[in-house]
């Protein structure tokens, strides 16, 4: 029981850390890029913010994978974010994984795992 409560508490702590102003700024810049890119606009890739936000979600994914954080809590609150980031940044993720296959691999796995048979928003590629 204690371990289960610890996993839930760790998940809550991770979710609270996502509310920090600097994390929200990273996410805002990345979402703006994703939205503009989906509309066909050519915009500069905010690489620093993308790497920071994907790195943050990779850390959360590792915590879920190794049982430190409760998967259901993370999935219920962040599933859409995982899918949106993964689908919106798939070209970038694929590019960096060509050089280093393990980069963002846990994040990518959770995004794919949690994206089960649901209608995706218009910004998502269908290939």
Regions found by a protein language model. Give the residues of each.
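Membrane-proximal alpha-helical anchors
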Residues: 1-38
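Short, positively charged
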Residues: 40-42
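An amphipathic alpha-helical interaction surface
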Residues: 44-127
């Amino acid at each position: 029981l204690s371990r289960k409560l610890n996993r839930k508490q760790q998940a809550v702590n991770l979710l609270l850390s996502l509310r920090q102003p600097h994390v929200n700024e990273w996410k805002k810049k990345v979402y703006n890029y994703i939205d503009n890119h989906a509309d066909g606009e050519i915009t500069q890739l905010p690489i620093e913010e993308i790497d920071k936000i994907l790195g943050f979600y990779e850390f959360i994914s590792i915590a879920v994978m190794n049982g430190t954080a409760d998967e259901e809590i993370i999935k219920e609150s962040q599933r859409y974010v995982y899918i949106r980031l993964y689908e919106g940044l798939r070209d970038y993720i694929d590019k960096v994984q060509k050089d280093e296959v393990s980069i963002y691999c846990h994040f990518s796995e959770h995004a794919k795992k949690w994206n089960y048979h649901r209608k995706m928003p218009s910004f998502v590629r269908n290939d």
